[in-house]
Amino acid sequence: MYRLKPFGVLDGREVPLIELFNDKCAVELLPYGAAVRAIRVPDRTGKLTDICLGYDELESYRTLDACFGGTIGRCANRIGGARFTIDGRSYRVTANEGENCLHGGIEGFHKKLWEFTCEENAVTFSYTSPDGEEGFPGAVRVEVTYRLIDNQLTIAYKAAAEQSTVVNLTNHTYFNLGGHSSGTVEDHVLTLRTSRYTPMDSGNIPVGTLAPVEGTPLDFRTPAAFGSRLHDKAFNGGRGYDHNYALDGGEGPVAELWCPATGIGLEMTTSMEGMQLYTAGWLTERKGKDGAVYGQAHGVCLETQHFPNAVNCPAFPSPILRKGETLQQWTAFRFFAR
């Protein structure tokens, strides 16, 4: 089922909050950014708990950074040097993180007001990115469908381009399975079905190779809590995780995240080959929902994606979408408590 509630006004247009709900859980969505605002699931005692970071007002989504819950595009993650070449033609896109392009530029998809349609258990958001937006070639039509069935939220992406361009879509929900206002995620236990990651240079740009996670702090093949690694100066300068994994593929979940305090967990499956693990190391203190105060390491993002900077790395799977092709990909989260 679904229902709409008032949330804000942007450029004279009403921006509603859209809630999908059933007898097991509920998800709140916003047309601004095609974003997830809240996910409420039962903890081990049956108490409904909101497990993702968000804001109480539209203005915060519009003006603040961090991309809370947003759909990221046209190209998620980083493009080194904010430039690339397709079919011999060079393009320069918006540099908004030093000399690099991050999450589609200054006004990425998470900063757009999307159209939407609702059905019984799903919402489909649509947006057409014009030719030249943030420097990217060709117009692209994008649809993102959120579907809630029982205790599973599936996010399905669809895109078509009018000329060859880069398309890499993801969702930037910050999960805190202790409850969105519960503080750091140091106690969260992560399991990943992946044996390799993409090494980066000093600017967080993948260098185009894969390396084994074995023997590094990136190895979560057996369940492990984040613990002190989220603040350890010897690991990523004390910023925690902001690393892309090359998923092993195959059937079944590629990630499990669990909070021992509440018993809430999630299993993630996806059609994508990569996943950025981000533990909010750059999240500055800010006011969130219900008077909560968020800060560094208060959330975990599991951003399924093409590899960062893949358009400049021939050995990586290509993120180029060509005219006549249709991009279709999906990620699903199954919530549980134990």
Where does each model-flagged region fall?
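An exposed, glycine/acidic-rich loop-and-rim segment of catalytic or binding clefts
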Residues: M1-R338
